[in-house]
Amino acid sequence: MGQDGIALFCTLHPASSEKAERCINLLCTSAREYYRTPRANCTAWSYFTPFQPKKANSIADHPVICGLEIYTTKAALQSQVDDPVYFQRYHEIVKQENLYARPEELVAWYPAGGFLTRDPSADGEEDGVLVSVTRMTAKRSFEDLMGILRPFVDWVTKTEPNVFTYAIFSRPKAPRELLLIVRYKDRKALKGHLEAPEHTDVVEKLTRALESDITQSTTLWQEVPDSFVNHGTGDGKSRDASAKL
């Protein structure tokens, strides 16, 4: 995906655990039948629920579902909003069945660095894929954070094949904010990443450049089935080996 793409970070607030399951089922149907098709111009569709080690498949008492959708252009994003069969129908069902406790939150972000995926094996169809979401606010500038992260991205790319995604996003409306999405093959990949000396070093550097504690700004999630991340559009068969953002 090029620098002119647009990402939509979504936060959904289902009214109950049962309604959360209903939302996920509806979303997964759309992922299979719409978002993977060429007309969607969607390069990533990753939805996730809170990671709970003791009950990996359960949903929290106050359920929340988050997701990242990436489109090739703003026009592609608008096309899916206008789609009557999947997007608009989904929201009709949400309203009819009172699936949400409160309105969803949608925030637009723009690719700024890192990589979206590595190869076809990293398309999110595996079980157990974990996702970390970190929101950072720089003390001075976004570029300060990028200066710290760029060398680390290179290290992750070269040495951590089980880190499927390491994607950095910016937001013009909040120029000092940075969104970091990292997808891991499994718990082992997450553990190895967090315990690496290089990770410890980059966290220390970021801590000095951030307004708040980075450890309090990161949440961990488990990716739902039917999520996918690929470079390019269409049926997912045409992908770069290293999809740079």
Model-derived segments and spans:
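Short S/T/G/P-rich N-terminal loop/turn motif that feeds into the first structured element of a domain
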Residues: 1-245
